[in-house]
Amino acid sequence: MAEKKEFVVGIDLGTTNSVIAWMKPDGTVEVIPNAEGSRVTPSVVAFTKSGEILVGEPAKRQMILNPERTIKSIKRKMGTDYKVRIDDKEYTPQEISAFILKKLKNDAEAYLGGEIKKAVITCPAYFNDAQRQATKEAGIIAGLEVLRIINEPTAAALAYGLDKAGKEEKVLVYDLGGGTFDVSILEIGEGVIEVIATAGNNHLGGDDFDQRLIDWMAEEFKKQHGIDLREDRQALQRLRDAAEKAKIELSTKMETDVSLPFIAVSPSGQPLHLEMRITRSLFESLTRDLVEMTRGPIEQALNDAKLSPQDIDEIILVGGMTRVPMVQRFIKEFFGKEPNKSVNPDEAVAIGAAIQAAILAGTEGAKGRDIVLVDVTPLTLGIEVKGGLFEPIIPRNTKIPVRKSKIFTTVEDGQTEVEIRVYQGERPIARENIFLGSFKLVGIPPAPRGVPQIEVTFDIDSDGIVHVSAKDLGSGKEQSMVVTGRHKLSEDEIKRMIEDAKRYEEQDKRLKEEIELKNRADDLAYSVEKTLKEHGDKIPADLKSRLEDMIRELRDAINRNDIPKVKMLFDDLQKESMKIGEYLYKSATGGETSNQ
């Protein structure tokens, strides 16, 4: 029997919808329809009471009847400790996402008449390490070898960039999907697509626009009938479906009618119907601030790339929400030019992923294609050092894959272990950033503080997943970890980090200066104390006693966090300790030292 043919695919695992595509032997890319005949599969999973698992359109269709056992927008929970509980079983976000990937895989295998083992899967550029790791795990659970995790805007630009070979351009990808917003600036030319800046909001998308319409309709109905439809799960589900449908219709029409018969029952037992007309201007007034929220990340990305809006050659729209006329108007007003609408906003990401998959797998259709994707890390990575400061090792917007090292040392005499605490963020104080995980390097030979040399290395692979290692250069002892931190921060924390860094810049600067002063004071106290122990017999007793008192007072001020006193005593101790050298020289030469 002939072996089944193997295919390599690209998958856009989206918050609202997912898409799968492959590159044909002739080099063109085909979006693969699902079993229902649609090129887009809703990212919805349902568990029926009989134990059947429904995915995609069948799951979405029964949401009204089975809201408690239906899961949508699970992508927002990727990389967190969130669990979905159905009956007595708990599911991680990775497992729910794997059901979606498995459906895409199975339907595509049936369509292509072969096997799919390898895939490139996309994620938002702003996904942190834990979220990328979770995306990769979802692929593995679904039975896929994940060739690479690539950023959605990068994939979209790849789909677009093929037609632009030989022309150097700066392209801004504006990606407003169901649950996330990303903006990336790319340089495209000579077969290289390079991300030069990325920013975004991990908690802004079509779901939020739907919610505004749901709330408006619910409030209007409540005014008329005194019943809040949001308190009834099935009524809320019908409202949600109607809101999504109205939003889509208002992209091409100036108004739409919503009709939901028998949505509730009055206290007297009368059936109640919801009949409303929603105009485009009403929809725009309800959601204008959401569109405005995309301005900050655009400005951030332009600022990071050191570009003005006029420097951008093309603006590509990605994500179904970019069909909304108000979004397109906003972009035109911001950049002073029309966005490029030649890329299908729902399919571009999957097409780009399929191209990258074909290139990585070396398939027939990709022969002669030499495209290099250069991604960047979205937030600075580093470790906590003495005094709780954050020491950056890989700055934000560094091209990946990347490997960087720095040498650190011990802060106590005889210290035999160090804890490496890894953080991601833009604040100079470690605890203000996202904690990604920690590990201990043990077995350091005892030595005075400052003597051991510990090399800390950060290695980010092509999927954006972080590997951290620490090596004691003296003993050769080494310890490492792959960052899989499932931090419990809310999802919009990442988006806020860069804004926080700006807002707290002055406060952080002052705090950093205070910590650095205390560190310098502590180092000086240690150094003077060590000199007194080693050469005490050569120093007059009154100077030695005075210095010991000053060291004691300085350490007390450090412990009490009395910064003005630390500064004063640090300066005094510096001046007074200069006299030690004078006596050591006198002792060494056996002569008198003249006073200046």
From Swiss-Prot:
<comment type="similarity">
    <text>Belongs to the heat shock protein 70 family.</text>
</comment>
<dbReference type="GO" id="GO:0042026">
    <property type="term" value="P:protein refolding"/>
</dbReference>
<dbReference type="Pfam" id="PF00012">
    <property type="entry name" value="HSP70"/>
</dbReference>
<dbReference type="InterPro" id="IPR029048">
    <property type="entry name" value="HSP70_C_sf"/>
</dbReference>
<dbReference type="InterPro" id="IPR029047">
    <property type="entry name" value="HSP70_peptide-bd_sf"/>
</dbReference>
<dbReference type="InterPro" id="IPR012725">
    <property type="entry name" value="Chaperone_DnaK"/>
</dbReference>
<dbReference type="GO" id="GO:0051085">
    <property type="term" value="P:chaperone cofactor-dependent protein refolding"/>
</dbReference>
<dbReference type="GO" id="GO:0016887">
    <property type="term" value="F:ATP hydrolysis activity"/>
</dbReference>
<keyword id="KW-0143">Chaperone</keyword>
<keyword id="KW-0547">Nucleotide-binding</keyword>
<comment type="function">
    <text>Acts as a chaperone.</text>
</comment>
<feature type="modified residue" description="Phosphothreonine; by autocatalysis">
    <location>
        <position position="180"/>
    </location>
</feature>
<dbReference type="InterPro" id="IPR013126">
    <property type="entry name" value="Hsp_70_fam"/>
</dbReference>
<dbReference type="GO" id="GO:0044183">
    <property type="term" value="F:protein folding chaperone"/>
</dbReference>
<keyword id="KW-0597">Phosphoprotein</keyword>
<dbReference type="GO" id="GO:0140662">
    <property type="term" value="F:ATP-dependent protein folding chaperone"/>
</dbReference>
<dbReference type="InterPro" id="IPR018181">
    <property type="entry name" value="Heat_shock_70_CS"/>
</dbReference>
<keyword id="KW-0067">ATP-binding</keyword>
<protein>
    <recommendedName>
        <fullName>Chaperone protein DnaK</fullName>
    </recommendedName>
</protein>
<dbReference type="GO" id="GO:0005524">
    <property type="term" value="F:ATP binding"/>
</dbReference>
<dbReference type="InterPro" id="IPR043129">
    <property type="entry name" value="ATPase_NBD"/>
</dbReference>
<dbReference type="GO" id="GO:0031072">
    <property type="term" value="F:heat shock protein binding"/>
</dbReference>
<dbReference type="GO" id="GO:0051082">
    <property type="term" value="F:unfolded protein binding"/>
</dbReference>
<keyword id="KW-0346">Stress response</keyword>
